[in-house]
Structures are given as C-alpha cells and as structure tokens.
C-alpha cells in the first residue's frame, strides 16, 4: 500500500516526464507504476497539486504542474517576484498560459480579506481589492498564491 505522498510524487513525476492529456492516461501510468487509484481520488490529487491543462502548441491540451511546484527549490524565497502591475487600485497579474483560472479560483476560495474579487482569462487575472487596501497589502496577499 502506498502513501498519499508517494502517489502525489508519482503523479508529479509522470506529468513532468510524459505527455498526459487526460485522467485516463494518468490512471494507466499510475497503475503501470504500481499504484491502485480510483478516478475520484486522482481527481482530488490533481486539484490538490493544482495541475492545469495547457495548450502545448500542437493543438492539444496536456497536464502541467504549476511553475512553483517545479522550480520551488531552484528559486530562493527572497528572489520571487510576482508579475503584478496596478492600474489605479486594480491589480493585473500575468501567469503562464492556462494557469490564470486555477490561480484565481485558489485566491477566491481562500478569500483573503484584502481581495474583493478576481476575474481570470487564460494567462491574466484582474484582481479587485477592497476599498482602502494599499498596493503593498494586495501584493502581500497575492504572494501566497503566485
């Protein structure tokens, strides 16, 4: 019997090394690696890992891990710079293609007190702060998600 951490590590490894375009393919790869997983469990794991389906440039969509999961150890904590720009009190966050909706959903579900709402496209998030919240506080609130 494998632990959840082992299964999550296996999912990350498979997504990083193989072209996976749906849960069925990922389930098969996990089974080939010795993991017995239901589709419901896999779906929860994918959500927990914040796996996104992104366009691969060939007309297909494939699973990708968020950039922070892949390069978290490679980038020292002090060197992280989110790509956030402001227009008045509105913040615009640029992400990798396909990641904006997942990140915006994460922000909305955690509901930081500084953020009123988000609107997401494919690679851009419009962040609407609450009245009177400074840009510095918005950046601090968003830094937990990007």
From Swiss-Prot:
Primary localisation category: cytoplasm
GO molecular function term, any single one: arginine binding
Transcription regulation recorded as keyword: yes
Keyword Cell membrane: no
Keywords: Amino-acid biosynthesis, Arginine biosynthesis, Cytoplasm, DNA-binding, Repressor, Transcription, Transcription regulation
Pfam family, one: Arg_repressor
Location relative to the cell: Cytoplasm
GO cellular component: cytoplasm
Pathway(s) served: Amino-acid biosynthesis; L-arginine biosynthesis [regulation]
GO annotation terms (biological process): L-arginine biosynthetic process; protein complex oligomerization; regulation of arginine biosynthetic process
Family under the similarity heading: Belongs to the ArgR family.
Function: Regulates arginine biosynthesis genes.
Name of the protein: Arginine repressor
Organism: Parabacteroides distasonis (strain ATCC 8503 / DSM 20701 / CIP 104284 / JCM 5825 / NCTC 11152)
Chain's gene name: argR
